[in-house]
């Protein structure tokens, strides 16, 4: 995950991406 992707999501959105397996917690 790059900075632009990170900035495009709030905490809830990031948690959803992790839950769906699109990114790992380490990436975030």
UniProtKB/Swiss-Prot annotation:
Record keyword Transferase present: no
Spans traversing the lipid bilayer: none
Keywords in alphabetical order: Hydrolase
Catalytic activity from the UniProt record: an anilide + H2O = aniline + a carboxylate + H(+)
Entry EC no(s): 3.5.1.13
GO molecular function: aryl-acylamidase activity
Organism domain of life: Bacteria
Subunit relationships: Homodimer.
Further comment found in the protein's record: Also acts on 4-substituted anilides.
Name this protein carries in UniProt: Aryl acylamidase
């Amino acid at each position: 995950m790059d900075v632009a992707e990170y900035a495009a999501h709030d905490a809830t959105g990031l948690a959803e991406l992790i839950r769906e397996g699109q990114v790992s917690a380490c990436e975030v």
